[in-house]
């Protein structure tokens, strides 16, 4: 965001919400911009997923550790005290680039990048994903890359549903028998299926993370202004997590063979709170610094600490899948619409 963009949005906020609320929102947005500059050009941190041990890595997009912990009573493989991993990114594009490419590293650390250290692991990795930023990955560096969003996108849900991602992951596991399998679901990331009517996801194709033009932008601005509560948005966020566990994770665990399956995320989600927030159970205290959603390169702990829950999986053979993915070509305009619908534009 440029200074002019910030000034324009500030005027809109003050006009819509008044000097006090609008001014506070603009100050928070300015701080987020400062944190972005720090994360891009100075202080940042995290650990590559290829540094950790796993056979199947399940990526639940935007899933916080405390959100996953709320599922502990419903699924026996999810503990009350969720272990964590420090992600390389605070948004998907940063996570994809830093884990799978050399593109996002400055020259002083280029000798530590993924293609230097993890080329062998990547060559034995199948990546089945519904995240559009997989386009930044060199397909030849992987054993197999399946961009499910290209043919599995659902216009009614404004996202790629979890069941088709599971079907494609099971097909990849059975066909290629990869040493490593990454399965990247878009849920619990917005659009939140329980809030589509309220914010008009069914009427407007685009949404975003900051501002007030598209449905999710409207949601975050209303949260910033106190029109909608954190509890309401959190409830919708939790409902999306239940959706991906029921339709995605559960059938996956019953239809692949893996000694170590890890449930994790690319980054977290923040709701603009300033005080110290305690995760469920024995998790650490952390701040959100007045930041909303998941802007890239913002090195705050609440965005960078993600779940790292280990379990196992056994292929029952119950799920019947097609080996070859459907053929589909996505135009640039369709791709832009989908990026907007997921809050990236």
Roles of regions detected by a PLM:
Residues 1-345:
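Catalytic domains that recognize anionic headgroups
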């Amino acid at each position: 965001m440029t200074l002019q963009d910030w000034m324009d949005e500030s005027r809109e906020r003050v006009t819509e919400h008044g000097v006090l609320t609008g001014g506070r929102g603009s100050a928070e947005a300015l701080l987020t911009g400062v944190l972005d500059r720090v994360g891009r050009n100075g202080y940042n941190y995290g650990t590559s997923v290829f540094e950790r041990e796993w056979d199947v890595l399940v990526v639940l997009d935007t899933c916080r550790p405390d959100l996953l912990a709320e599922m502990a009573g419903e699924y026996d493989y999810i503990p009350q005290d969720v272990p964590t991993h420090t992600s390389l990114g605070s948004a998907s594009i940063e996570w994809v680039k830093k884990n799978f490419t050399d593109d996002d590293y400055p020259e002083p650390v280029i000798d530590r990048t993924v293609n230097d250290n993890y080329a062998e692991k990547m060559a034995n990795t199948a990546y089945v994903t519904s995240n559009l930023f997989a386009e930044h990955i060199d397909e030849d560096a992987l054993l197999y890359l399946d961009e499910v969003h290209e043919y599995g996108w659902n216009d009614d849900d404004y996202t790629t549903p979890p069941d088709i991602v599971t079907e494609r992951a099971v097909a990849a596991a059975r066909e290629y028998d990869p040493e490593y399998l990454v399965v990247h679901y878009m849920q619990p990331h917005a659009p939140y299926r329980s809030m589509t009517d309220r914010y008009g996801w069914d009427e407007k194709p685009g949404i975003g993370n900051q501002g007030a033009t598209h449905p999710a932008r409207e949601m975050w601005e209303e949260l910033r202004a106190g029109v909608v509560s954190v509890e309401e948005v959190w409830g919708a966020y939790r409902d999306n997590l239940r959706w991906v566990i029921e339709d995605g994770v559960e059938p996956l665990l019953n239809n692949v063979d893996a000694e170590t399956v890890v449930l994790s995320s690319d980054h977290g989600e923040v709701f603009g709170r300033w005080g110290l927030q305690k995760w469920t159970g024995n998790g650490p205290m952390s701040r959100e610094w007045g930041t909303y959603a998941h802007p890239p390169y913002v090195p705050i702990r609440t965005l960078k600490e993600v779940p790292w829950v280990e379990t196992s999986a056994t292929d029952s053979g119950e799920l019947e899948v097609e080996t070859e993915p459907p053929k589909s070509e996505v135009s640039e305009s369709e791709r832009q619409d989908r990026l907007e619908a997921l809050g990236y534009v």
